[in-house]
UniProtKB/Swiss-Prot annotation:
<protein>
    <recommendedName>
        <fullName>Methyl-coenzyme M reductase I subunit alpha</fullName>
        <ecNumber>2.8.4.1</ecNumber>
    </recommendedName>
</protein>
<comment type="function">
    <text>Component of the methyl-coenzyme M reductase (MCR) I that catalyzes the reductive cleavage of methyl-coenzyme M (CoM-S-CH3 or 2-(methylthio)ethanesulfonate) using coenzyme B (CoB or 7-mercaptoheptanoylthreonine phosphate) as reductant which results in the production of methane and the mixed heterodisulfide of CoB and CoM (CoM-S-S-CoB). This is the final step in methanogenesis.</text>
</comment>
<keyword id="KW-0484">Methanogenesis</keyword>
<dbReference type="Pfam" id="PF02249">
    <property type="entry name" value="MCR_alpha"/>
</dbReference>
<feature type="binding site" description="axial binding residue">
    <location>
        <position position="150"/>
    </location>
    <ligand>
        <name>coenzyme F430</name>
    </ligand>
</feature>
<dbReference type="GO" id="GO:0046872">
    <property type="term" value="F:metal ion binding"/>
</dbReference>
<dbReference type="GO" id="GO:0015948">
    <property type="term" value="P:methanogenesis"/>
</dbReference>
<feature type="binding site">
    <location>
        <position position="336"/>
    </location>
    <ligand>
        <name>coenzyme M</name>
    </ligand>
</feature>
<feature type="binding site">
    <location>
        <position position="447"/>
    </location>
    <ligand>
        <name>coenzyme M</name>
    </ligand>
</feature>
<comment type="subunit">
    <text>MCR is a hexamer of two alpha, two beta, and two gamma chains, forming a dimer of heterotrimers.</text>
</comment>
<keyword id="KW-0488">Methylation</keyword>
<keyword id="KW-0479">Metal-binding</keyword>
<dbReference type="InterPro" id="IPR015811">
    <property type="entry name" value="Me_CoM_Rdtase_asu_N_sub1"/>
</dbReference>
<dbReference type="InterPro" id="IPR015823">
    <property type="entry name" value="Me_CoM_Rdtase_asu_N_sub2"/>
</dbReference>
<keyword id="KW-0808">Transferase</keyword>
<dbReference type="Pfam" id="PF02745">
    <property type="entry name" value="MCR_alpha_N"/>
</dbReference>
<comment type="similarity">
    <text>Belongs to the methyl-coenzyme M reductase alpha subunit family.</text>
</comment>
Amino acid sequence: MSSAEEKLFMKALKEKFEESPEEKYTKFYIFGGWKQSERKKEFKEWADKIVEERGVPHYNPDIGVPLGQRKLMSYQVSGTDVFVEGDDLHFVNNAAMQQMWDDIRRTVIVGMDTAHRVLERRLGKEVTPETINEYMETLNHALPGGAVVQEHMVEIHPGLTWDCYAKIITGDLELADEIDDKFLIDIEKLFPEEQAEQLIKAIGNRTYQVCRMPTIVGHVCDGATMYRWAAMQIAMSFICAYKIAAGEAAVSDFAFASKHAEVINMGEMLPARRARGENEPGGVPFGVLADCVQTMRKYPDDPAKVALEVIAAGAMLYDQIWLGSYMSGGVGFTQYATAVYTDNILDDYVYYGLEYVEDKYGIAEAEPSMDVVKDVATEVTLYGLEQYERYPAAMETHFGGSQRAAVCAAAAGCSTAFATGHAQAGLNGWYLSQILHKEGHGRLGFYGYALQDQCGAANSLSVRSDEGLPLELRGPNYPNYAMNVGHLGEYAGIVQAAHAARGDAFCVHPVIKVAFADENLVFDFTEPRKEFAKGALREFEPAGERDLIVPAE
């Protein structure tokens, strides 16, 4: 076991509190209340201006429970040297977090092969690399809001939609050589050789267009709009580039083929009780989110980091934006998410588990059996609980029982997935960790937090009609997962842990994995935590701003 100074979280604990991390006693009511926070003082100054201008009350930190009775601690963004205030990790205060979701929501992938077949067989058009390049030129005019077919059509200012474009993905290397470089997401260039081979083989000779709609449209409309926006501009661009007459009988077939036949959304439509269309957070499966994150191609030999970056992205999207805002609202559930991507506590636990597994079994070399699940999950859970007991500062950092339960279980689940290369085994390791934790501490958190964990083992080891999906295909709307914070992002990380251990280039969909390797995306999906830190420091430059059409100040 590593010494205290070697713990990955020790630097953060020493920065956060004046006392030694091992100290059992602290002080209260001596820190100056909310005024100990520079950010809250800034908030109060702004609120006072707003109240003076409009005469209606606004933010007032003296309302409600007095803030600052305890130390208002800083947070170290895990995997970085950046310390920030907690307020800067609320997604409304963090432009990078917003852009991560914007870049996922505004992405729609549409296969081109069916449309090409209809063009050739029903409309008598020739499809060549040259015509594909011409079509892509047209689409990159139309997608950001340019008119292509009719006169007297209003258009959108390019400065508002500068982040909007379309590119091509193909596993056909001969075709890839003929596609203009500015339109191609080049698999061989962007991925390590072994991963590139896997992706090219999985995609085969199929061709896809990746459409990135304008961020600003997502701010005004919803995720389902992206699918419709892409469909309309694709159809108009095909009609223009291939000079299709609107009155031809086959055009209706072509319209379906080009707009709807091969659509890949990032999120599926939710049922009426959730009332959300495609490309909203509640419909994004865990495996799809894992494929959006690109850490695996940058750090292929570090499965722990790969899993941790996915957990961070998932916790932000599922806990902060989906459950914390769409399903709850207001201040939301920020600190359920921050527990897994700040202060290096989860990092310490996950790397401990990786080392344990590597020494005892080898990475992805153990059979996915209950014996392995019990061994690995128990070892890592007990290690995590011991750290909380040994270092009260870690307990204060994760002041909620459900935060600690999520962190221990995430480490146990990822470690089990590292051992077996199997996400279902990893999920069962998560469930076992929760049960062990409850036995040790009596409870896990708020009432109902552990609902899905109490009944989860049965449906992680068998396939049942309504509850038996493999973890890769489950998502926030899966039965029992629909309103439980501190779980969903970690599940995505367990998926990634299994596939990273196996050396897989993707978790669910090779085309989605390649789509998010695109270097023109605003958010850097190889390093979500570093991007969150930039957002917290107010150094991240987002898309979707309206400066061009508002008065200059």
